[in-house]
Regions:
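Sequence signature of WD/YWTD-type beta-propeller architectures
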Residues: 1-116
Length: 116
């Protein structure tokens, strides 16, 4: 069996895939974070794209100066997205580090926003 490689995104942004759990349980959607500047932790959205239709959806948008990234999906239903969330209203001394962030979960079934 041979596989043919396919490009599924074409816009000029950095679509950052985590190295594990990026497919929805039905294997139809890929989740990623969008980083305007390569590997920097400066993304504002967590998004997903349908592998066949190329339809894109924003799952979460950070507000108040916060940044988000490193998105993963629960491998079993219900679909839940987990990702790193930086602080709202960071000061000039803030930099990306393990003690300057939190993990959050967004449940696709409910519109509750991000839950710590």
């Amino acid at each position: 069996m041979s596989f043919q490689e396919q490009q599924i995104t074409f816009d000029s942004r950095h679509h950052q895939l985590t190295n594990i759990n990026v497919w929805t349980p039905d294997s139809q959607w890929l989740v990623y974070d969008v980083r305007p500047n390569g590997g920097s932790f400066t993304g504002l959205t967590i998004e997903k794209i349908h592998a066949k239709t190329k339809q894109q959806q924003i799952i979460y948008t950070a507000t108040q100066g916060a940044h988000v990234g490193v998105a993963t999906i629960s491998p079993v239903a219900p679909v839940r997205y987990a990702f790193i969330h930086g602080p709202e209203n960071p000061d000039d001394l803030w930099h990306y580090d393990f003690h300057h962030r939190r993990g959050v979960i967004v449940n696709e079934q409910e519109d509750l926003g991000a839950v710590n």
